[in-house]
Amino acid sequence: MDFILNLLPFIVNGLSLGLLFALIALGFMLIIGVMELINLAHGSLFALGAYLAMVVISPHFPWLGAFGTWYLGLPIVLRYVLAVVMAPALVAVVGMVLEVCMRPTYGKDPLYGLLLTFGAALVIEEAIRVVWGSAEQMLEVPQ
């Protein structure tokens, strides 16, 4: 019985990670099916959303000043709810800008769209690396 109880967190973590991968793959296939364009920036946009959610949950940037002090006083559960709402909205704005940049490639050779989204992925990943660094990040966990 102890073996099953010790194994349960690993099963839950594995299932949640598998569902996350399935969500990313479904989004990727939806973009390919609807737009007929291979969007290589899809994973980078997902990573950007994760980092933006991290900022909403625990803002640790000095430029926030007094707002950061006030914001950290909010309950952690409320900050998680705000992250679920704000991070996808912010990434949607970035995705809209990317879509406007991709419009000239519609109806042309698919290589143009492929190169554009590959370049966008490199730019987004480098922006993440410049702003947050390449070290692992920590988050507060609600109790």
Regions found by a protein language model. Give the residues of each.
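Small-residue-rich transmembrane alpha-helical segments that form helix-helix packing/gating elements
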Residues: 1-35, 40-143
